[in-house]
Structure formats: structure tokens, C-alpha cells
């Protein structure tokens, strides 16, 4: 399960892509860009475990939020497959600076040493030649973003702030606010569940994520996301670490489907009208 697959902009982009508005899809950009410094140094919750990874690992530790929705749009595991990646990281500076500026003398956390690069950048190539940029950035001051850029021969969507340009619809060389197109291209699942999901976690996408899972189980139908998707998204973590540790050498992405990705039909969210 990946809740960001169900955020409203991501599902609208999925529908727009299915309708062909962006043309042939060629490139996507995504990531998890979130200033977590204060959270990482708390004496509770994530502060009890999250820094430990930064002491011994260097790579992209959290690709799923950004890559999940992009993989859906690009038909990964359902017509295309991740082929190989290269990854590199900046030096590690942000957590050390936070130590010096915010922790009192004598705090045991001041003695910790970190190896995680503050910004990790990964490029992925698919078997059909598409490219995906994935970023991980949680140790520096910045506003939140998952980027979510999807680009094709006829246009693109770019998130944070959410904006769209579609040739023949948008003014030449200008962005349109995504809200200007939402009435026409909003995903029907959001239209169905908007009131019921109001007030739920992360703007309602957590509710829709759970609703879709329960609906699949009750109806005995395949879930929107399966174990092969989970494996594909998760393996990015160790593969980026290997590439970073080996001068950004390319590393192949395993095919957990054993070739069945070429046979499986395109994703259509359960309960939504199929786009032909």
C-alpha cells in the first residue's frame, strides 16, 4: 500500500495520462523532500529510530511516496519495467549542523556521526526507454514536496505548486493552475468519496487508500497495488545504496514478475470507469 498513489492531484494526473492529454509519456520526476531534522532528533516516535539509518546508510531510504504514483502512470509492472538505475549523494552536513545548533552540551546525540548524504539523486531507465528522476532530501531546510512531474509529447504536469501545460489547451508557453482543469479531469473515485474522506489523514488520501483495499477484499478482486509493486518500489533503497557506494555505477533492477509485466493489463483503479 502507498497512500500517495491516492492523493487527488496524482489521481487526476493518472486520469489525464490515460485520456492521452500528455501524449506519449517519456519522463517523470518525483521524490520525498521533507525537512525532518526536528523530528529525527525527538526523544520519541521516529526520533527513536530514524537517525540510526543515517549513521550507517547512504542512498534513497524512502522512494515509495514519489515513485509509486509515477510508476502507476508509466505502466511499470504492467507493460513496462524498471531496467537499471544510477544514484549519487551529496556530503552529509544537515544533521551535524542541527546537532551543533539545537542540542545542549552533554546530550549523547551530539556524539553521533552520520554518513547519509543530505540529498540523494537517482536516475532510473525503463526497458522502453523512459526516464525517471527520484530525489530524497530530508536533512536540510526546505518546504515539503514530492515533485510529481509527468511529461509527454503533448504536455506535462508539475507539482508543488500544482500546474499543468497541455498543448492545444493551455496558452502557449504558460502554465495553468491545476484547479482550472480539475472539474473536467478530476478522478471519479475522488468525486465519489470526497465527502466521506473529508477530514481523514493527509487530506483524505489515507481514507481512499484504505477504502480501495477494503473494497477489493470484500469483492474478491485484485488490489490496486500488489506484492510485485511493493517489491519493485522497496528494492530501490538497497540498489541506490549499492550505486552510491560504487561511484554511481549502474545497477540492474530485478524483475520480480519474471516477465509477466509484459502480459498484465494496465492499471485501472478498482471502482473507476475503464478508460479505453
What are these regions (language model features)?
Residues 141-161, 165-276:
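C-terminal helical cap and adjacent loop that interface with cofactors, partners, or active-site loops
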Residues 14, 67, 71, 123, ...:
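Non-transmembrane alpha-helical segments in soluble domains
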Amino acid at each position: 500500500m502507498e497512500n500517495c498513489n491516492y492523493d487527488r492531484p496524482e489521481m487526476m494526473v493518472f486520469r489525464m495520462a490515460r485520456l492521452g492529454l500528455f501524449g506519449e509519456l517519456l519522463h517523470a520526476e518525483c521524490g520525498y523532500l521533507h525537512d525532518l531534522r526536528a523530528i529525527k532528533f525527538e526523544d520519541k516516535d521516529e526520533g527513536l529510530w530514524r537517525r540510526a539509518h543515517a549513521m550507517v546508510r547512504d542512498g534513497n531510504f524512502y522512494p515509495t511516496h514519489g515513485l509509486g504514483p509515477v510508476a502507476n502512470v508509466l505502466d511499470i509492472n504492467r507493460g513496462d519495467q524498471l531496467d537499471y538505475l544510477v544514484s549519487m549523494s551529496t556530503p552529509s552536513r544537515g544533521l551535524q549542523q542541527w546537532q551543533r545548533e539545537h542540542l545542549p552540551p552533554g546530550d549523547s546525540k551530539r556524539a553521533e556521526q552520520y554518513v547519509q548524504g543530505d540529498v540523494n539523486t537517482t536516475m532510473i531507465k525503463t526497458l522502453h526507454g523512459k526516464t525517471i528522476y527520484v530525489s530524497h532530501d530530508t536533512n536540510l531546510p526546505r518546504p515539503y514536496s514530492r515533485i510529481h512531474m509527468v511529461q509527454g509529447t503533448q504536455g506535462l504536469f508539475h507539482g508543488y505548486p500544482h500546474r499543468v501545460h497541455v498543448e492545444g489547451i493551455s496558452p502557449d508557453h504558460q502554465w495553468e493552475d491545476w484547479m482550472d482543469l480539475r472539474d473536467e479531469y478530476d478522478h471519479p473515485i475522488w468525486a465519489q468519496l470526497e465527502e466521506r474522506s473529508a477530514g481523514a489523514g493527509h487530506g483524505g488520501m489515507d481514507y481512499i487508500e484504505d477504502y480501495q483495499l477494503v473494497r477489493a477484499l470484500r469483492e474478491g478482486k485484485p488490489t490496486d497495488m500488489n506484492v510485485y509493486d511493493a517489491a519493485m518500489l522497496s528494492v530501490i533503497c538497497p540498489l541506490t545504496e549499492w550505486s552510491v557506494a560504487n561511484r554511481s555505477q549502474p545497477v540492474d533492477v530485478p524483475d520480480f514478475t519474471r516477465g509477466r509485466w509484459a502480459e498484465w493489463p494496465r492499471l485501472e483503479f478498482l471502482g473507476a470507469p475503464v478508460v479505453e
